[in-house]
């Protein structure tokens, strides 16, 4: 009974303590590599691999981001203050005078996060910094890297991570009203092998 009363009392005290001045607080969310590994496993078990067109409109010129290739797995890694994203892939393209050829390998990429003030969204931009092709000794990797980055820029960047309105919510106050918790800002930090997201909330009477 005491716990139930205390649980009801806390939101009431928060609601009553609000004045005309807006009050703010910060909430921290910590995401580790294991979280993204489980999420990627679920994606590849339940959906088709993400696919991008590299060139033209014919059947040749498709790249798929797959779970694993050549011992490398698509993943999110938090290293040295960066979000490193190895991308395993397979696909095909048609170099001049050669015809359609198949390829596979993995790309080393970095995901840069930023808060877009105008759209009120946390967004990411993927940068390909290297491509490793299976069984070619590096031949053709530069061309594939350019095609991959161009396709990502056209069809993926910027990547919407968190729109702030999806992080906002209301807390019902019994017999009184609603405490609105509106997300007004978000910042991030990569350290200790985890991604830390800090969301700033503004508290108002609803």
Residue ranges of each PLM-predicted region?
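Bacterial N-terminal signal peptides
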Residues: 8-16
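Extracellular/lumenal and peripheral-membrane lipid-interaction modules
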Residues: 21-206
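Bacterial N-terminal signal peptides that target proteins for export
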Residues: 1-7
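N-terminal cationic amphipathic segment used for targeting or macromolecule association
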Residues: 5, 17-19, 122
């Amino acid at each position: 009974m005491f716990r139930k009363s205390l649980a009801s009392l806390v939101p009431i005290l928060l609601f009553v303590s609000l004045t005309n001045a807006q009050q703010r607080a910060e909430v921290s969310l910590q995401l580790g590599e294991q979280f993204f590994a489980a999420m990627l496993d679920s994606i590849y078990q339940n959906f088709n691999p993400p696919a991008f067109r590299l060139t033209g409109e014919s059947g040749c010129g498709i790249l798929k981001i797959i779970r694993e290739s050549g011992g490398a797995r698509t993943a999110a890694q938090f290293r040295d203050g960066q979000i490193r994203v190895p991308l395993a892939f397979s696909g095909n393209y048609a170099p001049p005078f050669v015809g359609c050829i198949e390829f596979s390998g993995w790309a080393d990429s970095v995901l840069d996060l930023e808060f877009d003030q105008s759209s009120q969204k946390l967004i990411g931009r993927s940068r390909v910094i290297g491509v490793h092709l299976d069984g070619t000794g590096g031949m053709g990797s530069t061309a594939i890297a350019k095609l991959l980055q161009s396709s990502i820029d056209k069809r993926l960047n910027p990547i919407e991570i968190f729109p702030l309105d999806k992080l906002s919510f209301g807390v019902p106050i019994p017999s009184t009203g609603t405490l609105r918790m509106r997300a007004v800002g978000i910042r991030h930090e990569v350290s200790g092998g985890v991604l830390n997201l800090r969301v700033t909330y503004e508290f108002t009477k609803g």
